Amino acid sequence: TGCVHTAPGFGADDYVTCKRYGMDMVVPVDDQGKHTDYAGKYAGMGTDESNPVILKDMKESGMLFASEEIIHSYPHCWRCKHPIIFRATPQWFCSVDSFKDEATGACEDVRWVPAWGKDRMRSMILERTDWCISRQRRWGLPIPVFYCDDCSKPVCTDESIESVAKIYETEGSNAWFEREAAELLPEGFTCPHCGGKHFTKETDTLDGWFDSGSTHYAAMERDQGFWPATMYIEGLDQYRGWFQSSLLVAVGALGRGAPFKECVTHGWTVDGEGRAMHKSLGNGMDPAEIFNKYGADLLRLWAGSSDYHVDVRCSDEIFKQLSQNYLKFRNTARYCLGNLDGFDANDLVKPEDMLELDKWALTRLNKLIEKAFAAYDEYEFHVVSHLINDFCVVELSNFYLDIIKDRLYCSGKNSLERRSAQTALFLILDTLTKMFAPILAFTCDEIWLSMPHRGSDDARNVVLNEMNKPFAEYALDDAEMAKWDALISVRNDVNGVLEKARADKRIGKPLEASVTLRASGESKAVLDKISDMDLKELLIVSECLIAEDDAADADAVTAAGSYNPGLTVSVKEAEGTKCPRCWIHSKDADPETGLCPRCKAVLSEAN
């Protein structure tokens, strides 16, 4: 057992306890933080001022057992950082018990992003107490209540509200502070309780959350077609704030459902170490400085690359890393634009004529489109950014763009081989530019104004065009894509041995190499899948052979595959003459010019 200090006027827990036992709600401290007359000899003293006096009196009277200073967690003002006390005061409340079921039911009709938002909102509504809607501030929207000077009872009737509302329509809510009570009420108005004729205005203002929670009515009621709002988006703290107040006002005051169809929440922007940004810490970042140093689109890319459902880190180091992703996309676009010069976007190669490698690229693009659309639908912008970056790096730069350089640079200008690659490049660039435009608005518009367009496009601005849907007519089936997966795994093994040969000074560039592939076990099936492909083009070497024997060339660099156990790759210097135009080593080169048969034919046709 023990004695517990209980002060119902200075703490919520004590208030509830004393209310349960019918104890008086004593509050011997006024609005200025000074003791009232109830405190006797301590009246007029501030609470901090009275503490040592009370201790002294207790000690002198023999009532003080012990006195000691301790360090403990204590509430402080968020603005001035001084310690505060809690004090019970008369307030206006809105009871939510009568419509909690309706409010939680309204949550079911909302799409919450992230999905756990629904359960969070429901639990907060179910657990909340009455809503205190009054504030003791000198600014804000006044609570339109009057007090009868005769009986002291509050007065708020349809007649008084209508009178105040008409004045607000012409003078605004400041009229409450500028006019006397008699000027705000209808002529001859009397107290409905006692018939009194003299009144005093309420001095409290309305809770700002009640104010903001009513904005959906003010903003959209005039145009019924816009209610409810398509989306509310704010920080995680607004489940207790704007989201909840808007929902409660819509359900409790208007008798409607939720005032929004979707509710999206985000975390906070913090520094590189995860700390909140404060002036006192000096860890904030000025957007203007980011614009000047990196450009506006990089700030947009930072926002579009961050998982905003949690706190988002922001630092100069992060912007430096993102600038590499930005440059990768920009360089990819520049490569495409450079190779689309003179291309007629209204004369695409037909699906049945397109080369299989180009179809592979468009099939991979189709997968990107499907995933990006799904991510956009869920407002997962960071997923879109990462998908596009991976596509530019893995599928394009590391594989496709490297291979088609030869066709783009060395095949005939109007040849099927070159136009097939250009068609794929155009569809890729067109898709990426439209897809990335919501995030990289300025860069994508710059690209859009520089690229060729189809007749159905609006050439003025990229955002005036719908995003591309998958190009099903150009897609490869699963079996065909499996063949290309096998080719990529073999290519990875070959590249590893090519690097080893370069390190051993056996070759310079890959085009100086002749590659021989030998397989055993499961790897034989892999080679069988790709045996009909133009391996020297796809591996970017001058020659590629598939050998049945197990004997590797003595003068070759030979190594086992890492991706395909049982695959052996041998690399040696290619025989023949190096073509001065395409750099491929050919045994059939022209003895006078050194041109390979392909380049000789292209130049002859051009002349």
Go through the PLM ranges and name each one:
Residues 77, 148, 191-194, 579, ...:
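Short cysteine-rich clusters marking metal-coordination/redox-active sites
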Residues 561-590, 595, 599-600:
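C-terminal accessory/binding modules appended to enzymatic or scaffolding proteins
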Residues 85, 156, 198-200, 584-590, ...:
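Short functional micro-motifs and their immediate structural scaffolds
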Residues 74, 91, 143-145, 188, ...:
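Residues immediately within or flanking Cys/His clusters that coordinate Zn2+
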Residues 199, 343-373, 401-497, 501-521, ...:
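Acidic, turn-prone loop/beta-hairpin segments
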Residues 136, 152, 195, 583-586, ...:
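Cys/His-coordinated zinc-binding microdomains
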Residues 2-161, 174-181, 242, 275, ...:
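Residue patterns forming the tRNA-binding/recognition surfaces of aminoacyl-tRNA synthetases
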Residues 21-33, 137-139, 161-311:
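Alpha-helical recognition segments enriched in aromatics with Gly/Pro capping
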